[in-house]
Amino acid sequence: MYKAFGIVSSSGRNIYVDGMQDYRPIGAFSFLGRYRVIDFPISNMTNSDIDRIQVYINNKPRSVVEHVGTGRHYNINSKSGKLQLLFSEHNNDNDIYNTDISCYLDNMESLSRMYHPYVVIAPSYMVYSIDFDQFLHTHIDSGADVTLLYHAVDNAKEAYLTCNVLGLNRQKGVESIEPNHGNKKNQYVYMDTCVMKTELFISLIKEAKNLSSMYTLTDILNDKCETLDIRGVAHKGFFASITDFPSYYAANMALLNYKSAQELFHDNWPIYTRTNDSCPTQYFNTADVKNSVISNGCQIEGTVENSVIGRGCVIKKGAVVRNSVILAEATVGEGVHVENEVVDKWAKLVHKKEIVSPTEQPGYIRRNDTL
Protein backbone atom coordinates (compact mmCIF):
# COMPACT_ATOMS: atom_id res chain seq x y z
CA MET A 1 0.00 0.00 0.00
CA TYR A 2 1.05 3.59 -0.59
CA LYS A 3 2.02 5.15 2.71
CA ALA A 4 -1.09 6.58 4.33
CA PHE A 5 -2.16 7.16 7.89
CA GLY A 6 -5.73 6.98 9.10
CA ILE A 7 -7.99 9.38 10.96
CA VAL A 8 -11.19 8.26 12.65
CA SER A 9 -13.25 11.42 13.08
CA SER A 10 -15.88 12.14 15.72
CA SER A 11 -19.49 13.09 15.00
CA GLY A 12 -20.41 16.68 14.27
CA ARG A 13 -22.82 18.98 16.05
CA ASN A 14 -25.64 18.12 13.61
CA ILE A 15 -25.59 14.49 14.74
CA TYR A 16 -27.27 13.35 17.94
CA VAL A 17 -28.75 10.03 19.03
CA ASP A 18 -31.41 10.79 21.63
CA GLY A 19 -30.92 9.08 24.98
CA MET A 20 -27.92 6.92 24.21
CA GLN A 21 -25.53 9.77 23.41
CA ASP A 22 -26.11 11.23 26.88
CA TYR A 23 -23.76 8.51 28.16
CA ARG A 24 -21.17 7.99 25.40
CA PRO A 25 -20.21 9.10 21.88
CA ILE A 26 -21.63 7.18 18.93
CA GLY A 27 -18.35 5.38 18.30
CA ALA A 28 -18.74 3.67 21.69
CA PHE A 29 -22.30 2.46 21.00
CA SER A 30 -22.81 -1.28 21.29
CA PHE A 31 -23.54 -2.73 17.87
CA LEU A 32 -24.92 -6.15 17.01
CA GLY A 33 -24.28 -7.38 20.54
CA ARG A 34 -20.51 -7.79 20.65
CA TYR A 35 -19.08 -4.86 18.67
CA ARG A 36 -18.79 -1.12 19.10
CA VAL A 37 -19.46 1.15 16.13
CA ILE A 38 -15.87 2.41 16.13
CA ASP A 39 -14.60 -1.15 15.56
CA PHE A 40 -15.62 -0.93 11.90
CA PRO A 41 -13.55 2.06 10.71
CA ILE A 42 -10.51 0.95 12.71
CA SER A 43 -10.76 -2.64 11.42
CA ASN A 44 -11.14 -1.38 7.84
CA MET A 45 -7.90 0.55 8.28
CA THR A 46 -5.86 -2.22 9.88
CA ASN A 47 -7.11 -4.77 7.32
CA SER A 48 -5.91 -2.31 4.65
CA ASP A 49 -2.40 -2.20 6.18
CA ILE A 50 -2.88 1.25 7.70
CA ASP A 51 -1.04 0.91 10.99
CA ARG A 52 -0.80 4.55 12.09
CA ILE A 53 -4.25 5.68 13.19
CA GLN A 54 -5.47 8.78 14.99
CA VAL A 55 -8.85 8.55 16.77
CA TYR A 56 -10.39 11.95 17.55
CA ILE A 57 -12.78 12.31 20.49
CA ASN A 58 -14.80 15.44 21.21
CA ASN A 59 -16.59 14.67 24.49
CA LYS A 60 -17.50 11.91 26.95
CA PRO A 61 -14.27 10.04 26.13
CA ARG A 62 -14.29 7.37 28.86
CA SER A 63 -16.17 4.64 26.94
CA VAL A 64 -14.04 5.04 23.81
CA VAL A 65 -10.80 5.10 25.80
CA GLU A 66 -11.77 1.94 27.72
CA HIS A 67 -12.74 0.07 24.57
CA VAL A 68 -10.02 1.16 22.15
CA GLY A 69 -7.16 1.33 24.67
CA THR A 70 -3.78 0.89 23.01
CA GLY A 71 -5.36 -0.69 19.94
CA ARG A 72 -3.65 -4.07 20.39
CA HIS A 73 -6.86 -5.99 19.70
CA TYR A 74 -7.11 -4.33 16.26
CA ASN A 75 -4.08 -6.26 14.99
CA ILE A 76 -1.88 -3.17 14.67
CA ASN A 77 1.81 -3.89 14.11
CA SER A 78 3.35 -3.14 17.51
CA LYS A 79 6.75 -2.22 16.04
CA SER A 80 5.82 0.12 13.20
CA GLY A 81 2.21 0.90 14.07
CA LYS A 82 0.51 3.11 16.61
CA LEU A 83 -3.01 4.11 17.57
CA GLN A 84 -3.42 7.55 19.16
CA LEU A 85 -6.44 8.87 21.03
CA LEU A 86 -6.59 12.63 20.51
CA PHE A 87 -8.88 15.08 22.27
CA SER A 88 -10.10 18.61 21.74
CA GLU A 89 -8.06 20.74 24.13
CA HIS A 90 -10.50 23.65 24.11
CA ASN A 91 -13.93 22.02 24.20
CA ASN A 92 -16.31 24.98 24.09
CA ASP A 93 -19.60 25.33 25.95
CA ASN A 94 -21.04 26.75 22.74
CA ASP A 95 -21.31 23.68 20.55
CA ILE A 96 -21.13 25.58 17.28
CA TYR A 97 -17.37 25.91 17.82
CA ASN A 98 -16.81 22.20 18.52
CA THR A 99 -16.03 21.18 14.95
CA ASP A 100 -13.69 18.61 13.47
CA ILE A 101 -11.51 21.50 12.25
CA SER A 102 -11.12 22.85 15.81
CA CYS A 103 -10.14 19.36 17.01
CA TYR A 104 -7.55 19.02 14.24
CA LEU A 105 -6.15 22.46 15.08
CA ASP A 106 -5.80 21.48 18.73
CA ASN A 107 -3.73 18.49 17.59
CA MET A 108 -1.83 20.14 14.75
CA GLU A 109 1.50 19.14 16.28
CA SER A 110 0.57 15.44 16.04
CA LEU A 111 -0.70 15.90 12.49
CA SER A 112 2.40 17.76 11.36
CA ARG A 113 4.64 14.95 12.59
CA MET A 114 2.96 12.33 10.39
CA TYR A 115 5.46 11.45 7.67
CA HIS A 116 2.93 9.62 5.47
CA PRO A 117 2.19 11.39 2.17
CA TYR A 118 -1.54 10.51 2.23
CA VAL A 119 -4.33 10.56 4.81
CA VAL A 120 -7.50 8.45 4.84
CA ILE A 121 -10.33 9.91 6.92
CA ALA A 122 -13.34 7.83 8.04
CA PRO A 123 -16.13 8.58 10.55
CA SER A 124 -16.67 6.82 13.87
CA TYR A 125 -20.46 6.78 13.35
CA MET A 126 -20.90 4.85 10.09
CA VAL A 127 -20.84 1.08 9.60
CA TYR A 128 -19.49 -0.42 6.38
CA SER A 129 -16.63 -2.53 5.03
CA ILE A 130 -14.11 -1.23 2.51
CA ASP A 131 -10.57 -1.93 1.37
CA PHE A 132 -8.85 1.43 1.84
CA ASP A 133 -5.84 0.15 -0.09
CA GLN A 134 -7.98 -0.11 -3.21
CA PHE A 135 -9.65 3.22 -2.39
CA LEU A 136 -6.25 4.93 -2.16
CA HIS A 137 -5.02 3.34 -5.40
CA THR A 138 -8.16 4.56 -7.18
CA HIS A 139 -7.50 8.07 -5.88
CA ILE A 140 -3.85 8.12 -6.97
CA ASP A 141 -4.55 6.59 -10.39
CA SER A 142 -7.24 9.20 -11.09
CA GLY A 143 -4.93 12.13 -10.40
CA ALA A 144 -7.62 13.81 -8.27
CA ASP A 145 -6.81 16.19 -5.44
CA VAL A 146 -9.46 14.68 -3.15
CA THR A 147 -11.58 11.54 -3.49
CA LEU A 148 -14.84 11.18 -1.55
CA LEU A 149 -16.70 7.94 -0.82
CA TYR A 150 -20.46 7.89 -1.37
CA HIS A 151 -23.33 5.41 -1.26
CA ALA A 152 -26.23 5.60 -3.71
CA VAL A 153 -29.62 5.31 -1.94
CA ASP A 154 -33.24 5.41 -3.06
CA ASN A 155 -34.85 6.34 0.27
CA ALA A 156 -33.26 9.72 0.99
CA LYS A 157 -36.68 11.31 1.59
CA GLU A 158 -37.18 9.27 4.77
CA ALA A 159 -33.63 8.37 5.82
CA TYR A 160 -30.16 9.95 5.95
CA LEU A 161 -31.72 13.32 6.83
CA THR A 162 -28.72 14.33 8.96
CA CYS A 163 -26.22 13.34 6.27
CA ASN A 164 -24.72 15.29 3.40
CA VAL A 165 -25.26 14.37 -0.24
CA LEU A 166 -23.02 14.85 -3.26
CA GLY A 167 -23.82 16.59 -6.49
CA LEU A 168 -21.96 14.64 -9.18
CA ASN A 169 -21.40 15.27 -12.87
CA ARG A 170 -21.26 12.49 -15.46
CA GLN A 171 -17.56 11.93 -14.86
CA LYS A 172 -18.18 11.45 -11.10
CA GLY A 173 -16.70 14.85 -10.39
CA VAL A 174 -18.07 16.40 -7.20
CA GLU A 175 -19.85 19.70 -7.86
CA SER A 176 -21.32 20.22 -4.39
CA ILE A 177 -21.61 18.75 -0.88
CA GLU A 178 -24.93 19.77 0.65
CA PRO A 179 -27.25 18.69 3.49
CA ASN A 180 -29.91 16.15 2.58
CA HIS A 181 -33.15 18.15 2.69
CA GLY A 182 -35.33 15.08 2.08
CA ASN A 183 -36.73 16.41 -1.20
CA LYS A 184 -35.38 13.63 -3.45
CA LYS A 185 -35.48 9.88 -2.92
CA ASN A 186 -32.41 9.10 -5.06
CA GLN A 187 -29.26 10.64 -3.65
CA TYR A 188 -25.54 10.03 -3.34
CA VAL A 189 -24.97 10.02 0.42
CA TYR A 190 -21.52 11.27 1.38
CA MET A 191 -20.02 8.74 3.79
CA ASP A 192 -17.76 11.36 5.44
CA THR A 193 -14.86 9.29 4.12
CA CYS A 194 -12.14 10.77 1.95
CA VAL A 195 -8.50 10.53 0.91
CA MET A 196 -6.03 13.26 -0.02
CA LYS A 197 -2.41 14.25 0.40
CA THR A 198 -1.46 15.08 3.98
CA GLU A 199 -0.02 18.41 2.88
CA LEU A 200 -3.33 19.40 1.27
CA PHE A 201 -5.28 18.23 4.34
CA ILE A 202 -3.24 20.45 6.67
CA SER A 203 -3.58 23.44 4.34
CA LEU A 204 -7.37 22.97 4.20
CA ILE A 205 -7.54 22.91 8.01
CA LYS A 206 -5.69 26.22 8.23
CA GLU A 207 -7.75 27.82 5.48
CA ALA A 208 -11.01 26.70 7.11
CA LYS A 209 -9.93 28.31 10.40
CA ASN A 210 -9.25 31.61 8.63
CA LEU A 211 -12.62 31.56 6.87
CA SER A 212 -14.86 30.71 9.83
CA SER A 213 -14.60 29.32 13.36
CA MET A 214 -17.71 27.26 12.58
CA TYR A 215 -16.30 25.60 9.45
CA THR A 216 -16.03 21.83 9.18
CA LEU A 217 -13.88 19.81 6.79
CA THR A 218 -17.00 19.22 4.69
CA ASP A 219 -17.60 22.98 4.48
CA ILE A 220 -14.13 23.75 3.17
CA LEU A 221 -14.29 20.83 0.71
CA ASN A 222 -17.59 22.17 -0.60
CA ASP A 223 -15.97 25.58 -1.11
CA LYS A 224 -13.14 23.93 -3.04
CA CYS A 225 -15.32 21.97 -5.48
CA GLU A 226 -14.69 24.57 -8.20
CA THR A 227 -10.94 24.98 -7.69
CA LEU A 228 -9.82 21.46 -6.70
CA ASP A 229 -10.29 18.21 -8.60
CA ILE A 230 -12.65 16.43 -6.20
CA ARG A 231 -14.09 13.12 -7.33
CA GLY A 232 -16.55 10.58 -5.97
CA VAL A 233 -16.15 6.82 -5.68
CA ALA A 234 -19.19 4.59 -5.13
CA HIS A 235 -19.35 2.18 -2.20
CA LYS A 236 -21.06 -1.18 -2.66
CA GLY A 237 -22.35 -3.42 0.11
CA PHE A 238 -23.97 -2.83 3.48
CA PHE A 239 -23.95 0.76 4.73
CA ALA A 240 -25.47 2.28 7.87
CA SER A 241 -25.17 5.88 8.99
CA ILE A 242 -25.84 6.08 12.72
CA THR A 243 -26.77 9.73 13.03
CA ASP A 244 -30.02 9.58 15.02
CA PHE A 245 -31.96 7.12 17.19
CA PRO A 246 -34.08 5.52 14.41
CA SER A 247 -30.96 4.86 12.31
CA TYR A 248 -29.22 3.09 15.23
CA TYR A 249 -32.20 0.81 15.77
CA ALA A 250 -32.65 0.19 12.03
CA ALA A 251 -28.97 -0.69 11.51
CA ASN A 252 -29.09 -3.41 14.17
CA MET A 253 -32.38 -4.79 12.85
CA ALA A 254 -31.14 -4.80 9.24
CA LEU A 255 -28.26 -7.13 10.07
CA LEU A 256 -30.61 -9.80 11.36
CA ASN A 257 -31.15 -10.43 7.66
CA TYR A 258 -28.51 -12.97 6.64
CA LYS A 259 -28.02 -11.47 3.18
CA SER A 260 -27.34 -8.03 4.66
CA ALA A 261 -24.92 -9.50 7.18
CA GLN A 262 -23.03 -11.23 4.36
CA GLU A 263 -22.54 -7.84 2.69
CA LEU A 264 -20.85 -6.50 5.83
CA PHE A 265 -18.91 -9.47 7.20
CA HIS A 266 -16.42 -11.35 5.03
CA ASP A 267 -14.20 -14.34 5.84
CA ASN A 268 -11.03 -12.52 4.80
CA TRP A 269 -12.03 -9.20 6.39
CA PRO A 270 -12.35 -9.62 10.17
CA ILE A 271 -13.95 -6.95 12.32
CA TYR A 272 -11.81 -6.72 15.44
CA THR A 273 -13.12 -5.82 18.87
CA ARG A 274 -12.07 -6.03 22.48
CA THR A 275 -12.48 -9.61 23.64
CA ASN A 276 -14.51 -10.57 26.67
CA ASP A 277 -13.78 -13.92 28.31
CA SER A 278 -17.28 -14.86 29.39
CA CYS A 279 -18.99 -18.24 29.41
CA PRO A 280 -21.26 -19.38 26.57
CA THR A 281 -24.91 -18.39 26.73
CA GLN A 282 -27.20 -20.79 28.61
CA TYR A 283 -30.44 -21.77 26.90
CA PHE A 284 -32.94 -23.34 29.30
CA ASN A 285 -35.73 -25.77 28.39
CA THR A 286 -38.26 -22.95 28.27
CA ALA A 287 -36.18 -20.84 25.88
CA ASP A 288 -37.48 -20.11 22.37
CA VAL A 289 -35.12 -18.10 20.14
CA LYS A 290 -35.77 -17.16 16.50
CA ASN A 291 -33.80 -14.99 14.05
CA SER A 292 -31.76 -13.24 16.74
CA VAL A 293 -28.16 -12.43 17.59
CA ILE A 294 -27.31 -13.56 21.12
CA SER A 295 -23.98 -12.61 22.70
CA ASN A 296 -21.96 -14.62 25.22
CA GLY A 297 -22.72 -14.82 28.92
CA CYS A 298 -26.52 -14.61 28.68
CA GLN A 299 -29.20 -16.66 30.41
CA ILE A 300 -32.19 -17.26 28.16
CA GLU A 301 -35.33 -18.78 29.69
CA GLY A 302 -37.96 -16.85 27.72
CA THR A 303 -38.83 -16.05 24.10
CA VAL A 304 -36.55 -13.95 21.88
CA GLU A 305 -37.56 -13.08 18.31
CA ASN A 306 -35.90 -10.77 15.77
CA SER A 307 -33.73 -9.16 18.42
CA VAL A 308 -30.13 -8.37 19.33
CA ILE A 309 -29.10 -9.39 22.85
CA GLY A 310 -25.86 -8.02 24.33
CA ARG A 311 -23.39 -9.74 26.64
CA GLY A 312 -24.52 -10.91 30.06
CA CYS A 313 -28.25 -10.31 29.62
CA VAL A 314 -30.89 -12.28 31.52
CA ILE A 315 -34.23 -13.12 29.85
CA LYS A 316 -36.40 -14.73 32.52
CA LYS A 317 -39.02 -17.46 32.13
CA GLY A 318 -42.18 -16.25 30.41
CA ALA A 319 -40.51 -13.07 29.16
CA VAL A 320 -41.00 -12.11 25.51
CA VAL A 321 -38.51 -9.93 23.62
CA ARG A 322 -39.41 -8.99 20.04
CA ASN A 323 -37.85 -6.60 17.54
CA SER A 324 -35.63 -5.11 20.22
CA VAL A 325 -32.00 -4.28 20.93
CA ILE A 326 -31.00 -5.22 24.48
CA LEU A 327 -27.62 -3.89 25.57
CA ALA A 328 -25.19 -5.64 27.93
CA GLU A 329 -26.13 -6.76 31.45
CA ALA A 330 -29.82 -5.89 31.11
CA THR A 331 -32.53 -8.02 32.74
CA VAL A 332 -36.01 -8.80 31.40
CA GLY A 333 -38.04 -10.24 34.25
CA GLU A 334 -40.64 -13.02 34.36
CA GLY A 335 -43.69 -12.42 32.21
CA VAL A 336 -42.40 -9.10 30.84
CA HIS A 337 -43.24 -8.33 27.20
CA VAL A 338 -40.73 -6.04 25.44
CA GLU A 339 -41.28 -5.06 21.82
CA ASN A 340 -39.74 -2.43 19.51
CA GLU A 341 -37.39 -1.11 22.19
CA VAL A 342 -33.73 -0.27 22.71
CA VAL A 343 -32.84 -1.20 26.30
CA ASP A 344 -29.62 0.37 27.56
CA LYS A 345 -27.00 -1.27 29.78
CA TRP A 346 -27.88 -2.52 33.27
CA ALA A 347 -31.59 -1.74 32.88
CA LYS A 348 -34.00 -3.98 34.82
CA LEU A 349 -37.46 -4.55 33.35
CA VAL A 350 -39.19 -6.41 36.15
CA HIS A 351 -42.34 -4.67 37.43
CA LYS A 352 -44.00 -3.21 34.34
CA LYS A 353 -45.23 -6.21 32.34
CA GLU A 354 -45.98 -4.54 28.99
CA ILE A 355 -43.29 -2.34 27.41
CA VAL A 356 -44.25 -1.96 23.76
CA SER A 357 -43.61 0.92 21.37
CA PRO A 358 -45.02 1.47 17.86
CA THR A 359 -43.13 -0.26 15.05
CA GLU A 360 -42.47 3.05 13.30
CA GLN A 361 -41.24 4.75 16.50
CA PRO A 362 -39.10 2.40 18.65
CA GLY A 363 -38.71 3.32 22.31
CA TYR A 364 -35.68 3.77 24.55
CA ILE A 365 -35.13 2.52 28.13
CA ARG A 366 -32.43 4.47 29.91
CA ARG A 367 -29.17 3.08 31.21
CA ASN A 368 -29.38 1.58 34.72
CA ASP A 369 -33.13 2.24 34.86
CA THR A 370 -35.67 0.02 36.61
CA LEU A 371 -39.19 -0.38 35.26
Predicted regions and their residues:
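Unchanged
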Residues: 1-254, 365
